[in-house]
Amino acid sequence: MTRFVGCIDLHDGKVKQIVGGTLSSKPDGEAPVTNFVSDKSPSHYAHLYASNDVQGSHVIRLGQSNDEAALMALQAAPGFLQLGGGVTKDNCQYWLQWASKVIVTSALFDSDGSFQLQRLREISGLCGRARLVVDLSCRRASDGASWTVMMNKWQTPTTLALNEETLALLSEYCSEFLIHAADVEGLCRGIDEELVAQLGLWAAQLRGDVRVVYAGGANSVADLGLVKRLSGGRVDLTYGSALDIFGGSLVRFQDCCAWNRQQ
């Protein structure tokens, strides 16, 4: 059934909420649009999620200079949080010393955005399928009716389409998908209902142990019920800028935890 999943986004060593589409991979790129900068430590949020048993919550390193902050969060709740951002075949096992799973994205593609299945096979072999999440964050394609997987902080389109065939193929090597709708991420203007419904249809065809998590635009605790209805309970939901723990005024963290307890 649809559950609330927590996130801890790290940027420049601090817990932040950023409008996802404004991140840049260029050293001289413009500063991202930031909704919230926390005065609390990453470990504070790790304890918060762990003490409320918000399973599947993740830490994402958005750019450089976040290793120390990521370790602080992971070591505050060993084996509880997932870790994403800059995960490669060379460091995945290092992070799995403290993370429950690692999340991989750009490492699966060449610099031009061409998907490399062999890279996924290699990382899956190192981590184990059960401890690997593939991030298929996406933008709507120019036709308006399909989605393209993005990499490099959602700035670079890849050759991979987000569809049933892609999920079926990749699920042989991972146990979970994390999908940010980059077009609406951080805007608090509502979820991409069409994408959530499609994810539910595609998830129904996957192995029973595969989890699908959607992120982007959620602005009400009622969105949990909406995602449950649209996806048939096959897709989980994460909140960011709308949450009170991230300075938001639209969604109470404890209401989301109460939803999980009721499911």
Curated annotation (Swiss-Prot):
It is found in: Cytoplasm. CDD domains: HisA_HisF. InterPro entries: Aldolase_TIM, His6-like_euk, His_biosynth, Isoase_HisA-like, RibuloseP-bd_barrel. It catalyses: 1-(5-phospho-beta-D-ribosyl)-5-[(5-phospho-beta-D-ribosylamino)methylideneamino]imidazole-4-carboxamide = 5-[(5-phospho-1-deoxy-D-ribulos-1-ylimino)methylamino]-1-(5-phospho-beta-D-ribosyl)imidazole-4-carboxamide. GO terms for biological process: L-histidine biosynthetic process. One of its GO terms (molecular function) is 1-(5-phosphoribosyl)-5-[(5-phosphoribosylamino)methylideneamino]imidazole-4-carboxamide isomerase activity. Its EC number is 5.3.1.16. Pathway: Amino-acid biosynthesis; L-histidine biosynthesis; L-histidine from 5-phospho-alpha-D-ribose 1-diphosphate: step 4/9. One of its GO terms (cellular component) is cytoplasm. Keywords: Amino-acid biosynthesis, Cytoplasm, Histidine biosynthesis, Isomerase. It is an enzyme of class 5 (isomerase). It comes from the Eukaryota. Gene3D superfamilies: Aldolase class I. Belongs to the HisA/HisF family. This is 1-(5-phosphoribosyl)-5-[(5-phosphoribosylamino)methylideneamino] imidazole-4-carboxamide isomerase. It comes from Eremothecium gossypii (strain ATCC 10895 / CBS 109.51 / FGSC 9923 / NRRL Y-1056). The lineage of its organism: Eukaryota, Fungi, Dikarya, Ascomycota, Saccharomycotina.
